[in-house]
């Protein structure tokens, strides 16, 4: 509802909580591609996008569903390890397309210390695609590997098997032991790096 004669109705996408136009304007002015990280309730989506007068052009992209379908990932598709692996995949595709630098775009996500969006950005930097980010907000290596998930699973196995089966039903249905997530993370990460070893010059 309007609040007076000088009230200005926000743009539709701002009203819907989809776009911060001021931040977008600043990123477009930089002249660099954007490393776009978005999370839904179940998935992580990462894109490298460049702005053109006719609209945004996606240079490279990755969806966490690919981790399960193509690389055998048995963990959750919306957690911190999945965010890192999805960011890794998008970054490698960006490098293959010739992108060396991008500005971070986390949309309207609140920049919380250790957030999943920063795990994806860390992955890009780890393989040589420069995306500025403060070290203080990046999740720890233990968290990126899923050590916290494995520890919680082990605790539930011993303290409450019923709760364990409820919380980790997806893992169990795939025949995967969540306490082995850190080891599994390294295996899937290496599969992705092996596929793009030509990009990394290995």
From Swiss-Prot:
UniProt entry tagged with the keyword Ligase: no
Coiled-coil region list: none
Domain of life: Archaea
Record-level GO cellular component terms: cytosolic large ribosomal subunit
InterPro entries membership: Rbsml_uL18_euk
Signal sequence, start to end: none
UniProt-listed Gene3D superfamilies: 3.30.420.100
GO molecular function: 5S rRNA binding; structural constituent of ribosome
GO biological process terms, semicolon-separated: ribosomal large subunit assembly; translation
CDD domains assigned: Ribosomal_L18_L5e (cd00432)
Record's keyword terms, sorted: Ribonucleoprotein, Ribosomal protein, RNA-binding, rRNA-binding
Family, as annotated: Belongs to the universal ribosomal protein uL18 family.
Function in brief: This is one of the proteins that bind and probably mediate the attachment of the 5S RNA into the large ribosomal subunit, where it forms part of the central protuberance.
Quaternary structure annotation from Swiss-Prot or TrEMBL: Part of the 50S ribosomal subunit. Contacts the 5S and 23S rRNAs.
Name the record gives this protein: Large ribosomal subunit protein uL18
Species, as recorded: Staphylothermus marinus (strain ATCC 43588 / DSM 3639 / JCM 9404 / F1)
